[in-house]
């Protein structure tokens, strides 16, 4: 999974701003949640609001990628007027679940939870082996190496993945299409959405994603060349340019 280093390529290109990147719960160097806790996207909001208050940030722009973009939508809604701008990088609210699909979604979450007792973290001999495994999942060599320092922990048998495996599980409850549309419509902050042409949503899915995001009242919606991790790769400079022009 991604971690705070996902923004390490963009950060120098956005050096006119104070960029604060966090490892969300269960990712990177952040703690895993307790055994009885969940990783629904709304579970991160109280923690992030607490961080913002602790840092005494009266007003801020919110930037999120992938799952972080879904969380960013909810965070912007919770911040209300304290959110000056919202930037979504190849991410949005998760695919909605129709009412009739809710029981199947719930059952999948229970099956995932039952398998947790047998889970053992993946262990790699070295960083190169980790990178090869990530490349098979669609990462570039560059993006995998960028994430590695906060994705792995050295143990007696090698380098183990540190993220909480529950982050890969199905959520017991997901938003309906109407709920997603309502959250988009309720956003009262200028929003920049950059969807990668070879990202998470491609071809027909990209068209439906754009249609859903068009429900945001003040949304500058663009497609950019590259993959899901374009902001860590060859597309970083162009993406940074879009962000600077938007926030300026």
What are these regions (language model features)?
Residues 89-123:
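A catalytic-pocket lid/entrance helix-loop region that shapes and gates access to the active site
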Residues 6-8, 30-36, 97-100, 204-205:
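Conserved catalytic-core motifs of eukaryotic protein kinase domains, centered on the activation segment
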Residues 186-227:
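Conserved loop-alpha-helix segment in the C-terminal half of the alpha/beta-hydrolase fold
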Residues 57-102:
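Conserved hydrolase catalytic core segment
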Residues 123-200:
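Alpha/beta-hydrolase
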Residues 1-31:
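Conserved HGGG/HGGXW glycine-rich cap/lid loop of the alpha/beta-hydrolase fold
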Residues 20-63, 241:
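Active-site loop/oxyanion-hole signature of alpha/beta-hydrolase fold enzymes
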Residues 224-236:
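Catalytic histidine-centered segment of alpha/beta-hydrolase-like enzymes
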């Amino acid at each position: 999974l991604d971690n705070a280093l996902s923004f390490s390529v963009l950060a120098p290109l956005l050096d006119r701003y104070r960029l604060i990147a966090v490892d969300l719960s269960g990712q990177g160097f952040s703690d895993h949640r307790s055994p009885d806790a969940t990783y629904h996207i709304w579970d991160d909001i109280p923690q992030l609001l607490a961080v913002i208050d602790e840092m005494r940030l009266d007003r801020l722009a919110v930037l999120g990628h992938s799952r972080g973009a879904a969380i960013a939508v909810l965070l912007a809604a919770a911040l209300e007027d304290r959110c000056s701008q919202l930037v979504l990088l190849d991410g949005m609210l998760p695919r909605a679940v129709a009412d009739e699909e809710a029981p199947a979604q719930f059952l999948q979450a229970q099956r995932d939870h039952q398998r947790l007792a047998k889970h053992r973290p993946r262990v790699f001999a070295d960083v190169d082996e980790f990178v090869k495994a990530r490349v098979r999942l669609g990462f570039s060599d560059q993006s995998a190496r960028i994430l590695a320092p906060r994705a792995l922990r050295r143990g007696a048998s090698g380098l183990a993945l540190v993220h909480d495996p529950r982050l890969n599980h199905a959520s017991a409850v997901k938003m309906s299409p109407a709920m997603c549309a309502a959250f988009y419509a309720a956003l009262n902050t200028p929003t920049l959405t950059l969807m990668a042409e070879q990202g998470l949503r491609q071809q027909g899915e990209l068209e439906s994603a754009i249609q859903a995001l068009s429900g945001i009242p003040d949304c500058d919606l663009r497609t950019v060349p590259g993959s899901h991790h374009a902001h860590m790769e060859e597309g970083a400079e162009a993406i940074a340019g879009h962000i600077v022009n938007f926030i300026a």
